[in-house]
Regions:
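A residue-level marker of the well-folded mature domains of exported/periplasmic proteins
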Residues: 1-167
Length: 167
């Protein structure tokens, strides 16, 4: 399913028909997966662990250290978040765990903006361009829930005359 919230309906229909089911790269929520186990249904999920993906994203940023990240000198990492689909559990986990990794590294964070980019490069480019116009040099980190949106963010950052990792 495109939206994780529809997994229960799909699972019920497929199980009623007696067909095994594999969800690929769209992880249903934990309650739904627990339901499969409780009912001993032939249903599974195959894909990446979005919690881990978010954690890795945050850890890569945290490795830079607060001295490099805190360009405006307020003692915090000021960031914007460009999310995928808000109903998608992967987007929710990537959003939560990327920021949590910075906090776990002892960094104080400050969310300047959070927008939904719907996994789309052009939409993310527009959202980041608007955020840069609104928040200027205060934006120190741009989180994106997928690579397409990250490419859009990069284009917006470059168009604003900034260089990733430098300013």
């Amino acid at each position: 399913p495109v939206n994780s919230s529809s997994a229960a309906t799909i699972t019920d229909k497929v199980q009623t028909a007696g067909i095994p089911l594999v969800y690929i790269n769209r992880e249903p929520d934990e309650d739904e997966e627990a339901r499969w186990k409780d009912k001993n249904w032939d249903v599974t999920y195959v894909g990446c662990d979005a919690r881990q993906s978010g954690t890795f994203q945050g850890e890569i940023i945290a490795k830079e250290g607060i001295d490099k990240l805190d360009m405006n000198g307020n003692g915090k990492v000021d960031y914007i978040m460009i999310k995928g689909d808000p109903e998608n559990i992967d987007a929710q986990y990537r959003t939560e765990f990327s920021v949590k990794a910075l906090q776990d590294a002892g960094m104080e964070v400050n969310k300047l903006d959070e927008q939904v980019g719907n996994w789309d490069q052009a939409q993310a480019q527009s959202l980041v361009a608007n955020a840069l116009a609104k928040n200027g040099k205060d934006i120190e980190v741009v989180f994106c829930n997928n690579d397409s949106m990250a490419l859009g963010a990069l284009q917006a950052i470059q168009a604003a005359g900034r260089t990733v990792g430098k300013d």
